[in-house]
């Protein structure tokens, strides 16, 4: 019997979205983006087309327009409920209508509706947005164009109003009916060193001799198998800067959009200092949902996410300081924790945790992060040990606002370091839980190693806090400052600080300057950064700084319709409508009243498909929440436009041509399962990881059979070569392990740097003056030449 898979129409209609075109303008560390979606209705009936797509959470969307038969229709930003009502009314009257909105449950998911698209009609829908570009640890500015929207697990009590509930069709990459092209123009007064990408780019074209302007494009034939990531390297990215922007002339001079705005960017040179060795409670909250059984990337031999997570937890455990407290949680539809409450870090507790880490599996179903978070926050605080929370998730959570609100409510008692794993992780969730708690957010995509990025954040967590942060302004008489950004509580070494402010009063008519100084105290030492700026800015019709400032204000107040109070909602609405920046309470709507063709019966509804990546696990998760939707379906889903198959994979929306291949894969799944597993690196395959797993909690190594195998030397030869037999035998084996690491694990040094420090500190306490002699003997035995300076001698 033939099985029909997915959504199949009787006459095999084509999808109305034909092309997505993105123009990107990057000036210093701000990106201005223009995205155009080109639609064409090749059917014989009017259509309503819906396209659900991801966008970075920091994006400030400020313009939405449609071009129909040469006529531009500019959308108006309205209260979301009013916009929905007008959209429905326009369609009922035969007008053409367009609606753009954020999802009710996540700020990084948007839906675009094109209603009453007539047969043969072509429409270009354009949206514009601006965003800050995050800074990577190597100094690169990172722009991400999300192409992947992962399925989001459904909370059982969630409303059906979310656009995440729409059954978004999926098709194989080769059958994707629309294309993407992107061109990026980059300018920086400091000069552009290079541009890198995870996708194929055209050769970089420098537009000026001094390399302050450049252009790159995606090559033709780009597949939607990954997010599009650009890494931009400037020659002097660490230079502080201040940009001033004049307000809109038609707005009140003292209003948000009428007064001049300033954007301050500091990159303080904070020296690295050693934190207290016994300070902190470290709780690691690890995603163990089914999606963690996916590969880290599409590259061959890529680790599964859960295997990378296990190695990451091992490295974190080995790098913790003696005397601290820790616990590990795993979460999915339910959650598990290693210990009833956080325990003191000792050899026994560390060994117990390592055994449990090695046995972890991605077997806890969906992604319900809120319940374990509440459990962590309810636990009693440990005096003298501030809570440091590390959250690892692929971001497949639908109701992000509830999670963000819970983290914010507990922000005074902890810092949260968040990690978005894989392409499609929710930027709204990952960025905001870090932002509201004073932590850092990290995204792990492509060839990134989870282990490297996690250890980098642990270094931040172990650093002493920067206290008494303050800003002082030096401005001409008659000019004052109103801060728009929330108070910054913490600055980490290597972290950039962006501040928005409003300049009130009279701007000077002649050339003049202002200055701003960032002051802070680190371990009793006063530090400061000062920068001077011009008060005669160039005109900017996009009002980029004003809109970014408005977005910053919205982010501090907007926690969605389910979480916001009446006062918060009104405040967000006022900021959104005044600035023209989209929020969760507003929506863009445009109506073409010149089209006045009454609709006969319901509009046929077409949901634009998204791609299925090779090796993606997204297919197997649709069925896991397909029956969990409560309440009435959205209006657009009540239109009987498709015949759904009755197969168990009914929520997989694939073209019929792809179904036979999937059926073959099902038939051979049992025989190929073991082979599939072999394609991915298993936990502990790396010899460096094997060596690290043998380290004791105090930082030392003991000489045993496992260590001798890694060193590649017989036990009797090792014992005979020990030049300090009167010392603790562990001193000799610890020196051998550290020497071996420096010779064989240099490419992963950032991952074992903390545990090496612990080993060296232990050696100084237990071997002292014998260290130089031990290092020389270790080099001789292992035939290496590691510099004794790495041991601090």
Swiss-Prot record:
CDD domains: vWA_interalpha_trypsin_inhibitor. The modification Phosphotyrosine is found at residue 622. One of its GO terms (cellular component) is collagen-containing extracellular matrix. Keywords: Phosphoprotein, Tumor suppressor. Residues 281-469 form the VWFA domain. The keyword Protease does not apply. Residues 1-131 form the VIT domain. This is von Willebrand factor A domain-containing protein 5A. Coiled coil: none annotated. InterPro entries: VIT, VWF_A, vWFA_dom_sf. The keyword Phosphoprotein applies. Gene3D superfamilies: von Willebrand factor, type A domain. PROSITE patterns: VIT, VWFA. May play a role in tumorigenesis as a tumor suppressor. Altered expression of this protein and disruption of the molecular pathway it is involved in may contribute directly to or modify tumorigenesis. It comes from Mus musculus (Mouse). It comes from the Eukaryota.
């Amino acid at each position: 019997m033939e099985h029909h898979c997915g959504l199949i129409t009787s006459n095999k209609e084509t999808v109305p979205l034909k092309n997505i075109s993105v123009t990107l303008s990057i000036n210093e560390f701000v990106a201005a983006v223009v995205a155009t979606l080109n639609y064409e209705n090749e059917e014989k009936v009017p259509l309503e087309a819906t396209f659900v797509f991801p966008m970075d959470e920091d994006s400030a969307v400020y313009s939405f327009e449609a071009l129909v038969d040469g006529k531009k229709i500019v959308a108006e930003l309205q209260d979301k409920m009013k916009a929905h009502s007008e959209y429905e009314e326009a369609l009922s009257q035969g007008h053409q209508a367009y609606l753009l909105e954020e999802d009710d449950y996540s700020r990084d998911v948007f839906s675009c509706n094109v209603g009453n698209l007539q047969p043969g009609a072509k429409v270009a829908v354009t949206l514009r947005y601006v965003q800050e570009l995050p800074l990577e640890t190597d100094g690169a500015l990172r722009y991400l164009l999300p192409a992947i929207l992962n399925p989001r697990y459904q909370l059982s009590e969630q409303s059906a109003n979310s656009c995440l509930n729409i059954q978004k069709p999926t098709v194989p990459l080769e059958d994707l009916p629309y294309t993407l092209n992107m061109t990026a123009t980059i300018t920086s007064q400091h000069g552009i060193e290079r541009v890198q990408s995870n996708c194929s780019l055209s050769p970089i074209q420098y537009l000026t001799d001094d390399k302050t302007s450049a252009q790159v494009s995606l090559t033709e034939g780009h597949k939607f198998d990954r997010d599009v990531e650009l890494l931009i390297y400037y020659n002097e990215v660490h230079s502080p800067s201040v940009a001033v922007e004049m307000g809109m002339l038609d707005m009140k001079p003292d209003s948000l959009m009428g007064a001049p705005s300033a954007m301050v960017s500091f990159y303080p040179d904070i020296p690295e200092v050693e934190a207290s060795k016994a300070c902190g409670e470290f709780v690691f909250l690890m995603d163990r949902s089914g999606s963690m059984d996916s590969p880290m990337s599409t590259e061959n031999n890529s680790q599964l996410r859960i295997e990378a997570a296990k190695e990451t937890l091992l490295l974190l455990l080995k790098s913790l300081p003696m005397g601290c407290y820790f616990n590990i949680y795993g979460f999915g539809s339910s959650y598990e924790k290693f210990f009833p409450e956080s325990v003191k870090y000792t050899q026994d507790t560390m060994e117990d945790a390592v055994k449990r880490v090695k046995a972890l599996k991605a077997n806890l179903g969906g992604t319900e992060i809120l319940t374990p978070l509440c459990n962590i926050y309810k636990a009693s605080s440990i005096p003298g040990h501030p809570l440091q929370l590390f959250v690892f998730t692929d971001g497949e959570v639908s109701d992000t606002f509830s999670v963000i609100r819970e983290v914010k409510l507990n922000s005074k008692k902890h810092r949260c370091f968040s990690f978005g794993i894989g392409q499609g992780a929710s930027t709204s969730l990952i960025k905001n839980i870090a932002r509201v708690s004073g932590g850092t957010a990290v995204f792990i995509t492509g060839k990134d190693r989870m282990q490297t990025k996690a250890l980098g954040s642990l270094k931040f967590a172990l650093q002493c806090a920067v206290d008494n942060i303050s800003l002082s302004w030096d401005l001409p008489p008659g000019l004052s400052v109103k801060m728009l950004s929330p108070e910054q509580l913490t600055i980490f070494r290597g972290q950039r600080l962006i501040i928005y402010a409003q300049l009130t009063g009279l701007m000077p008519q002649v050339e003049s300057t202002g200055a701003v100084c960032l002051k802070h105290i680190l371990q009793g030492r006063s530090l400061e950064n000062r920068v001077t700026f011009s008060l005669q800015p160039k005109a900017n019709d996009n009002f980029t700084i004003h809109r970014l400032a408005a977005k910053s204000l919205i982010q501090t107040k907007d926690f969605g319709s389910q979480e916001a109070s009446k006062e918060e909602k009104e405040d967000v609405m006022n900021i959104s409508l005044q600035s023209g920046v989209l929020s969760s309470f507003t929506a863009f709507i445009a109506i073409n009243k010149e089209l006045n063709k009454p609709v006969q019966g319901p509009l046929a509804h077409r949901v634009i498909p998204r791609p299925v990546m090779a090796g993606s696990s997204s297919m197997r998760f649709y069925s896991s929440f397909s029956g969990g939707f409560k309440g009435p379906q959205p209006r657009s889903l009540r239109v009987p436009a498709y015949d759904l198959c009755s197969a168990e994979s009914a929520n997989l929306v694939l073209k019929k041509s792809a179904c036979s291949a999937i059926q073959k894969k099902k038939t051979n799944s049992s025989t190929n399962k073991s082979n599939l597993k072999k394609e991915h690196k298993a936990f502990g395959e790396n010899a460096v990881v094997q060596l690290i797993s043998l380290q004791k909690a105090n930082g030392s190594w003991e000489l045993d059979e496992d260590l001798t195998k890694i060193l590649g030397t017989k036990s009797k030869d090792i014992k005979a070569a020990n030049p300090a037999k009167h010392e603790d035998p562990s001193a000799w084996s610890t020196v051998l392990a550290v020497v071996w690491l420096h010779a064989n694990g240099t490419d992963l040094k950032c991952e074992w740097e903390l545990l090496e420090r612990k080993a060296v500190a232990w050696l100084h306490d237990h071997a002292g003056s014998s260290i130089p002699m031990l290092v020389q003997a270790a080099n001789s035995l292992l035939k290496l030449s590691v510099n004794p300076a790495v041991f601090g001698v």
